[in-house]
Amino acid sequence: MENQPITTDKEILGFITPNIMAITLIALTKTFSVHVGEADGFYFSEVIIVPILMGIMSAWHWRNMELTTRRTWFYNFLNCVIAAMLSGFVLGEGSICILIVSPLILCFVMIGYAIGRALFKKNNTGFNISVVSLLTVVFIADTLSKHEYNNVVADTIVINAPPAKIWKNVVAFKPIKQQPDFWLFRIGLPNPTAATVTGYHEGAGRKCIFSTGYAIGERISTYEPGKNLTFDIIDQPRDPEMMNHLDLLKGQFLLKDNGNGTTTVTGTRWYRLHVFPAWYYDLWAQSIVRNVHIRVMQHIKEISEAK
């Protein structure tokens, strides 16, 4: 059985129908979310309920097949690959965003498949209907619910220069020429390359320019030379990657004179996630925001310490 190709109708339907169902349901969530004023994002229903339903549906089609453990994993992995491709082509999701969500999708597809195998072996129609009905109710309730998760990330660096020399490089800096180290940046996630300003005062406009050409519009809300630069995010492009599911709210750079010719710079970002479960996506969001800080502050350190 291990080396047999996928040939039977039931095998093929186990791939086709779950993915048609998934794309249809997710498209509906996008439609309903717009009507209730939600930003675009991945919700609990999309990354947990839909994959579980996919697994259950596949289990029904494959219920009379004696699949080995390896083939079971392969089939469900293939289902996730098909779903990922459809998400990119039909829903316009970015490749890195799909990469981030894929482990979670595979996990819940496998859980759904295990639930389906148990249900259909028992042939308990009433119980089967109750489980699917419960998942449907949760799906609808989650789709119509508000989804927001706010967090803040702060990072520090010590620069061998006084605040007065560093300040101008904090407010605006020339293009970063060094290639990024962070692996997500290296495979295509937009990374910061430069910052420009329209003036050196409160209320001035500031732009953080990314490698893809996108620019985040900012307005300086606090301008204390050598001490505090705080800015509000006023415009953010809807990039198909992570930026489509994360709103940057505010940024800040605090400079502390250490009294020995060095300065401690603290970079802070406030952001809001529109993807759930938040605990999973925030692990990625924190890492991405932190690496944005590191890339920018390392550049500030390099040009500030240059003689």
Enumerate the predicted regions with their spans.
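Hydrophobic ligand-binding cavity/cleft-lining segments
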Residues: E2-F44, I48-I56, N76-I82, L86, ...
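A short, structured loop/turn motif at beta-sheet edges
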Residues: I159-A164, S221-N228, L254-T264, K301-K307
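A conserved amphipathic terminal alpha-helix motif
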Residues: S102-N128, Y271-K307
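Membrane-water interface at transmembrane helix exits
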Residues: T29-V34, S58-E66, S87, L91, ...
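Beta-strand/loop substructures that line and gate deep hydrophobic ligand-binding cavities in soluble
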Residues: T69-L78, I82-G88, E93-I100, R238-R290, ...
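Aromatic-acidic/polar surface patches that form glycan- and anion
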Residues: I159, I209, V289, H293
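Glycine-rich portal/gate segments that line the openings of hydrophobic small-molecule binding cavities
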Residues: Q4-G14, I26, K30-Y75, I105-L106, ...
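Short capping loops/turns at secondary-structure boundaries
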Residues: C97-L104, E148
